[in-house]
């Protein structure tokens, strides 16, 4: 299997596993305990806090550990709304945001803790340009005294589009509004400067940068901290903002992953950008320049990511015809629905064009040989999908072919045993 879906999740780095393992069976104490093992656990957590803060360009005291970016987004959005003035209840979110952010914002509007200018039950979407970057002019038009929060991602999970945070933060700050950035895909892949950009809140997750699943962080500036109300109540951990026994092993893994990412990010980015260019070149050469279209910016993009439309070939069918390559037709966090990508639709793609698009997201261990093989397999799959009769369900035919191949192999194995 050639795994090219690292924006969905990454394997845990063996060096991270090495840090985590002793914390399950040997150094397992609760960081809230006052005895020596508990204090050792506290030191482990605080070391990880410093490592995550360093990678994010933040201060350690600005890091709040959570169960992941989804919880962090809910804490950011719900926490700000809980303390917002009665006349300041609108939320503005980028149209291409991750489902975690969109879901949290829409839920706040549905529950009545937030409102939308048009009276709908969804948070207002800030338009994006055809390349997927946020339209700052549309943000400025929507800003008003009744806006509580602006949420815009640093880098998109489907197209890799990277937003310049400075004009977005300047627009929000000029109106005196709180600004939240989803840095989940950016952290560890491109430089993130939380304090320097002036963002109030940021959310992230360990499993996107070779750390464990089930741990993430909300980054909150000193000013934003005072605007947040906790969403989880209990023992008062994380300075009262996120109750619950700390996941020491997961947090330590997050810290180790952040430290490793800081050391390797520049070299990884250079190598992955070259491999993405090679992949695109090979596919265009094989299929023709008019048969492959780029979704997203040419340059302002994550170095490991490219989203391509294969004209006339459905993404699901291409995936079925290339089972040896793990690629994605959209966000893995959107519940696996059949709707076309909301990201590509917001960029102006038709439903058909969106359904013909696939995301390739490379990883730290991706090789040139894997890219050449993947390009060949995907190109073959695209050509096959186009050649198959429209009257034949492609996925059914592929399953039949795979079953026949499996039966043939089984017969060969049985014959070998008989002989």
Swiss-Prot record:
The record's keywords, sorted A to Z, are: Iron, Iron-sulfur, Metal-binding, Nitrogen fixation, Pyridoxal phosphate, Transferase
Family annotation (InterPro entries): Aminotrans_V_dom (IPR000192), Aminotrans_V_PyrdxlP_BS (IPR020578), Cysteine_dSase (IPR016454), PyrdxlP-dep_Trfase (IPR015424), PyrdxlP-dep_Trfase_major (IPR015421), PyrdxlP-dep_Trfase_small (IPR015422)
* Enzyme Commission number: 2.8.1.7
- Cross-referenced PROSITE patterns: AA_TRANSFER_CLASS_5
Question: From the Swiss-Prot or TrEMBL record, what is one GO molecular function term?
Answer: metal ion binding
> Per the record, what are the reactions this protein catalyses?
(sulfur carrier)-H + L-cysteine = (sulfur carrier)-SH + L-alanine
Which residue ranges does the record annotate as region Disordered? 392-419
What would be one Pfam family of this protein? Aminotran_5
So where does pyridoxal 5'-phosphate get bound?
69-70, 157, 185, 205-207, 245
Give residues annotated as binding [2Fe-2S] cluster.
Answer: 333
Amino acid composition bias (Polar residues), ranges on this chain: 404-413
Report the cofactors: pyridoxal 5'-phosphate
BP GO annotations: nitrogen fixation
Q: Which superkingdom, per the lineage?
A: Bacteria
What is the active site of this protein? 333
Q: Which residues carry this modification: N6-(pyridoxal phosphate)lysine?
A: 208
Function per UniProt: Catalyzes the removal of elemental sulfur atoms from cysteine to produce alanine. Seems to participate in the biosynthesis of the nitrogenase metalloclusters by providing the inorganic sulfur required for the Fe-S core formation.
Which protein family is it in? Belongs to the class-V pyridoxal-phosphate-dependent aminotransferase family. NifS/IscS subfamily.
Q: How does it assemble?
A: Homodimer.
Protein name listed in UniProt: Cysteine desulfurase
Gene source species: Frankia sp. (strain EuIK1)
The taxonomic lineage of its organism, from the top, reads: Bacteria, Bacillati, Actinomycetota, Actinomycetes, Frankiales
Q: Which gene encodes it?
A: nifS
């Amino acid at each position: 299997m050639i795994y090219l879906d690292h924006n969905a999740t990454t394997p845990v780095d063996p060096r991270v596993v090495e840090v985590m393992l002793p914390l399950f069976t040997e150094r397992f104490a609760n960081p809230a305990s006052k005895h020596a093992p508990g204090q050792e656990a506290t030191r482990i957590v605080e070391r990880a806090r410093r490592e995550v803060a360093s990678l994010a360009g933040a201060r350690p005291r600005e890091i709040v550990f959570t169960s992941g970016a989804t919880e962090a987004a809910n804490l950011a959005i719900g926490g700000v709304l809980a303390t917002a003035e009665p006349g300041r209840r609108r939320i503005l979110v980028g149209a291409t945001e991750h489902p975690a952010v969109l879901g949290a914002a829409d839920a706040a509007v549905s529950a009545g803790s937030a409102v939308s200018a048009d009276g709908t039950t969804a948070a207002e979407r800030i338009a994006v340009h055809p390349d997927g970057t946020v339209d700052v002019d549309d943000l400025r038009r929507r800003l008003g005294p009744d806006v509580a929060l602006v949420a815009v991602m640093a880098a998109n999970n489907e197209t890799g589009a990277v937003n310049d945070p400075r004009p977005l933060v300047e627009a929000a700050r000029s109106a005196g509004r709180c600004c939240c950035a989803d840095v989940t895909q950016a952290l560890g892949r491109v430089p993130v400067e939380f304090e320097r950009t002036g963002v109030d809140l940021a959310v992230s997750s360990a499993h996107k940068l070779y750390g464990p699943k089930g741990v993430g962080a909300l980054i909150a500036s000193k000013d934003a901290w005072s605007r947040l109300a906790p969403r989880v109540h209990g023992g008062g951990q994380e300075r009262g903002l996120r109750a619950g026994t700390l996941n020491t092993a997961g947090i330590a893994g997050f810290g180790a992953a952040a430290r490793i990412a800081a050391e390797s990010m520049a070299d990884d980015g250079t190598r992955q950008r070259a491999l993405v260019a090679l992949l695109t070149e090979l596919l265009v050469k094989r299929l023709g320049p008019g048969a492959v279209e780029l979704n997203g910016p040419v340059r302002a993009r994550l170095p490991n990511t490219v989203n391509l439309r294969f004209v006339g070939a459905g993404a699901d069918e291409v995936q079925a015809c290339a089972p040896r390559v793990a690629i994605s037709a959209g966000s893995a966090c959107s519940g696996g629905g059949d709707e076309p990508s909301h990201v590509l639709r917001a960029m102006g793609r038709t439903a058909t064009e969106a359904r013909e698009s696939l995301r390739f997201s490379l990883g730290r261990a991706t090789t040139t040989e894997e890219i050449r093989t993947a390009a060949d397999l995907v190109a073959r799959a695209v050509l096959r999908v186009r050649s198959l009769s429209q009257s034949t369900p492609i996925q059914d035919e592929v399953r039949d072919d795979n079953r026949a191949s499996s039966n043939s192999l089984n017969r060969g194995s049985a014959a070998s045993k008989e002989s």
